Curated annotation (Swiss-Prot):
Domain of life (superkingdom): Bacteria
Residue segments, region Disordered: 1-21
Name of the molecule in the record: Arginine biosynthesis bifunctional protein ArgJ
Organism: Corynebacterium jeikeium (strain K411)
Catalytic residues as annotated in Swiss-Prot or TrEMBL: T200 (nucleophile)
Pfam family membership, one: ArgJ
Enzyme nomenclature, EC number: 2.3.1.35, 2.3.1.1
Length: 405
């Protein structure tokens, strides 16, 4: 794939293109994946991404759940605008393990730092998997040793890393953005326990752009997450481990202007977010809920979340049932101002409720397709927001009822 003019950027996804994808597309990054034996399945379960420089700029966003996993606490404490590498394990969240969890997260970083020739604080640590089980540190430390010896700048190495961080994901999530002589790569995981504060997920973004300061990286990431990852709300649950990490190597030697860079980071975050929604646990319907006519954008987002979390609404979507009454019943519980007599609803562009009353043909709207767009107007203002969710299927219940067994 060739680079594109900055006014016509080239963006590809793991689901939409056979082009090179992932965290090793940008210059100055190495990656590796191994099977350390953490997952009972025997699948790969550890990954390492190293920023080979010359820069080591970084920015990160974390879960807002008050119960945080040890790797989140460790990485957050060392988030000073620089990271040289990140170690990731899947199959174990290292969450709710007390002092032992903190010790294990720190030991993981120390082992990686020793092998990579940097300080422990230069290494971010991320974990994903079952909460409450202590990490098998003999396997983790052996895995770090093996990872360091396998680091490679090939595209395949990045693809392997994307697969190694998967838990109940069915497919790896990767993306790439080509600017004018510089690029962005990304990989992510997460299909369940997805709600605001990034949704349950780990996302790693790399760029070979030269950023003058960590402030530029933070501004781009902080500006992108509210309208991308924070808008995914699959099941109303927020993970203890959510982390989005951006690392910049500067290897291209090119500094894009801030507006261009911010837009590119947003585009990549949106790309990964849509892949997360598409692979959500048990998903058969991808549902976008747009609420307008609210007093503020924040109110609109709150109302959209209330609808998206309503189990009766989600069941209706699973059954392709254009039951607009469930939308009204759900949104009526939102703690925002609305005109209860002037709410309008449409499914896939077809009005099904006007002024809180059923519209002609409402019961016959076809929702059999995989994508459903729900639009709601609260009738009191100009606020508008969109939240992405899914249906509630038999498979979702099956997957989550058997998760720890």
């Amino acid at each position: 794939m060739t680079s594109a003019d900055k006014n016509n950027p080239d963006t590809s996804t793991a689901q939409g293109s056979s082009a090179d994808l992932g965290v090793t597309v940008p210059k100055g990054f190495s990656a590796a994946a191994v099977t350390a034996g953490i997952k009972p399945s025997g699948k790969s379960d550890m990954a390492l991404i190293r920023n080979d420089g010359p820069d080591d700029i970084a920015a990160a966003m974390f879960t807002r759940n008050q119960v945080t996993a040890a790797p989140v606490r460790y990485t957050k404490a060392n988030n000073d605008g620089t990271f040289r590498a990140v170690v990731v394990n899947s199959g174990n969240a290292n969450a709710c393990n007390g002092a032992q969890g903190d010790k294990d997260a720190r030991a993981t970083a120390e082992k990686a730092a020793e092998l990579l020739g940097c300080q422990p604080g230069d290494v971010a640590v991320c974990s994903t998997g079952l909460i409450g089980d202590v990490l098998p540190m003999d396997k983790v430390l052996s895995g770090v040793d093996e990872l360091a010896g396998k680091l490679d700048q090939s595209i395949t190495a990045g693809n392997d890393a994307a697969r190694a961080i998967m838990t109940t994901d069915l497919v790896a999530k990767e993306a790439v953005y080509h600017g004018d002589g510089w690029s962005i790569g990304a990989m992510g995981k997460g299909v369940g326990m997805m709600a605001p504060s990034l949704a349950t997920m780990l996302v790693f973004i790399t760029t070979d752009a030269h950023l003058p300061s960590a402030d530029m990286a933070h501004e781009a990431l902080a500006g992108a997450t509210p309208t991308t990852f924070d808008c995914i709300d699959i099941d109303g649950a927020t993970s203890t481990n959510d982390t989005v990490l951006l690392m910049a190597s500067g290897a291209s030697g090119i500094t894009p202007d801030a507006e261009e860079f911010n837009a590119a980071i947003h585009q990549v975050c949106l790309d990964i977010a849509m892949q997360l929604q598409a692979d959500a646990e048990g998903v058969t319907k991808r549902v976008s809920i747009t609420v307008g006519g609210a007093e503020t954008d924040a109110d609109a987002q709150t109302a959209a979340r209330v609808i998206g979390r309503d189990n009766l609404f989600k069941c209706a979507m699973f059954g392709s049932d254009p039951n607009w009454g469930r939308v009204l019943a759900a949104v009526g519980m939102a703690p925002v101002k609305m005109n209860p007599e002037a709410i309008s609803v449409s499914f896939n562009g077809h009005p099904v409720c006007i002024n809180s009353t059923g519209a002609p043909g409402a019961r016959t709207v076809d929702l059999s397709g995989a994508d459903i767009a729900v639009e709601v107007d609260l009738g009191v203002g100009e606020g508008r927001a969109t939240v992405w969710t899914t249906d509630l299927s038999y498979s979702y219940v099956e997957i989550n009822s058997e998760y720890s067994t």
